[in-house]
Amino acid sequence: MISGTLSAAETNYNVLFIQSYTNSSSWHNNLIAGLQDGLEEGGVKANVVIEYLNADFWTFASECVIMRRICERARQRKTDLIVTSSDEAFFTLTHCGDSLPYQIPVVVSGIKYPDRKLFDRMPNVSGFTSVTDFNVLLEEAIRLFPARKEIVCLSDSSFLSAKGVEAVEEAWESFHKKHPEYSFKELNVQRKSLNSLITSICYDYHAHKYIVIAPKWIPFLS
């Protein structure tokens, strides 16, 4: 956590934990337990309130409306610290138009596509990233599926999805030099009809040759 923000000598802090998805996610209880255990081990007494953004369901504009409501509730509770889980929660928090994340400490976790310039402008933010190594994933994919020679990258039009595609394309450059027999294409699920996407990926005559990568979870995968 941010040095000097919470300490064992101070008690009863109000902590807001914003998760990117829903409480039906299989890992959400582990995240909550991890935060509560960490606070307890640090000797910090805190009231932890959990909010869920449900980013898989809403458009970004709707996420911003929801996040502003979350911030207003947090402000009314006199929240001392915000903790976020995964990219969507932090990105929407800092782009929803509310000033709260710029006024109090924010701890991030599980950020795959960090915006370094934003972090530089927010000295009140700390935490850790978990950047995906797509070079390792591509190598493992072809080891498991040696007969599949076409890499398909699924994306949507969101900022985070675009950042994910950039990361995959960067890994693809070195991968393709090592494995020139492979091909690569990106499919944006918001630029093609659902039927055409399903047909081209799942029911096409050559579908058994595809390795599909989704650098960011998108509702299409549901």
Roles of regions detected by a PLM:
Residues 4-222:
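Short hydrophobic alpha-helices and adjacent helix-cap/hinge residues
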